[in-house]
Swiss-Prot record:
Hydrolase in keyword set: yes
Co-factor binding details: Binds 1 zinc ion per subunit.
Record lineage: Bacteria, Pseudomonadati, Pseudomonadota, Gammaproteobacteria, Enterobacterales
UniProt name for this protein: Succinylglutamate desuccinylase
Binding site for Zn(2+): 53, 56, 147
Name of the gene this protein is made from: astE
Organism this protein belongs to: Yersinia pestis
Length: 330
């Protein structure tokens, strides 16, 4: 039986690149790229990606187990499915990326970088996702991009909705609620993420899922992500999810991107600051020539603080809380 992760890590294609089981047909489309199509009829085309950052191993392990169970017939398949391991060379080396962050390159932004394996990979992933969605006229398109964060978080499991000018899918929102996310963040401007690409270019209902903190293979406590794992299994098998057992999600929207625009940029937060740390109005957060930032709202929460990004890139985001009723859903 095909071992998706092991073959991807080997750097060599499988000897057999397509086959079928009692429930499905599968095809290897390239390194870390696999389609699975059920014999039965389906109404959804679903993309699940992991490993866009090579050191984010928990989502890779979760996705690989999902593929293993589908191919073994232990889990029925009810959707047309594309699974992707985003950056295999970085996964092999246990690094976030080798040259540049692929998750800043989508939507054609890779063309603005020095050509590398990672710019070529971003292009390949775009082409494969567009071709996958264009090849079927299913009524619903979904994309979940699985990640873990560099640092800890007051909300260990959270989602990020890409900016879009149309309302978000109500079905996707219900699924996100039922997989017991702690928080949901709404972007308010376009970006170079994989989820933004599939939303904007493919009209997919897309979301980036953050599952705890990045750890090496074998050190993840996957039990803390059991609701998300069950959610993915429910999604691909079209089975019901149990009702949410934890407290309601918290909702945030982005109000400021903290850009590092000068070599003397300083991010005035402690090195051990965790995601969703709160700061009061007037707090000085960034300093650089001609552009300091102080908290403008009564309270703002910081997400992804990282003062070491390259010039021109985002060193963090500032959020404000919002009500569920403020989220545009159709």
């Amino acid at each position: 039986m095909l071992d998706f992760l092991a073959i991807t890590l080997s750097g060599k294609p499988p000897q057999v690149i397509q086959g079928e089981t009692v429930n499905l047909k599968w095809q290897w489309l390239g390194e870390g790229i696999l389609t699975l199509v059920p014999h039965r009829s389906y109404t959804q085309s679903v993309v699940i990606s992991a490993g866009i950052h090579g050191n984010e191993t928990a989502p890779i392990e979760i996705l690989n187990q999902l593929v293993t169970d589908l191919l073994a017939g232990q889990l029925p398949l009810s959707v047309r499915l594309l699974v992707l391991l985003g950056n295999p060379p970085a996964i092999r080396k246990g690094k976030r990326y080798l040259s540049n962050d692929i998750n800043r390159m989508f939507g054609g932004r890779y063309q603005h970088y020095t050509p590398s394996d990672e710019t070529r990979r971003a292009s390949t992933l775009e082409q494969r996702v567009m071709a996958f969605f264009q090849a079927s006229h299913t009524s619903e398109r979904l994309h979940y991009d699985l990640h873990t964060a560099i640092r800890g978080s007051y909300h260990p499991r959270f989602g990020l909705l890409p900016y879009q000018q149309t309302p978000y899918s109500a079905a996707m929102f219900r699924w996100l609620r039922d997989i017991e996310l702690d928080a949901l963040v709404m972007h308010t401007s376009a970006g170079g993420t994989f989820a933004h690409f599939s939303s904007e270019r493919c009209q997919a209902a897309s979301c980036t899922l953050e599952l705890g903190k990045a750890l090496p293979f074998g050190e993840n406590q996957l039990s803390q992500f059991s609701a998300i794992t069950q959610g993915l299994r429910s999604l691909v098998s079209d089975s019901a999810l149990p009702a949410r057992k934890t407290e309601n999600m918290k909702y945030y929207r982005v109000v400021k991107s903290l850009l590092r625009q000068h070599p003397d940029f300083k991010l005035r937060v402690a090195e051990d600051t965790v995601n969703f740390t709160r700061f009061a109005q007037g707090t000085l957060l960034t300093e650089q020539p001609n552009d300091n930032y102080r908290v403008e709202h009564p309270y703002e929460w910081i997400l992804f603080p990282n003062p070491h990004v390259a010039l021109g890139l985002r060193a963090g985001m500032m959020l404000v809380k919002m009500c569920e009723s403020e989220l545009p859903i159709t």
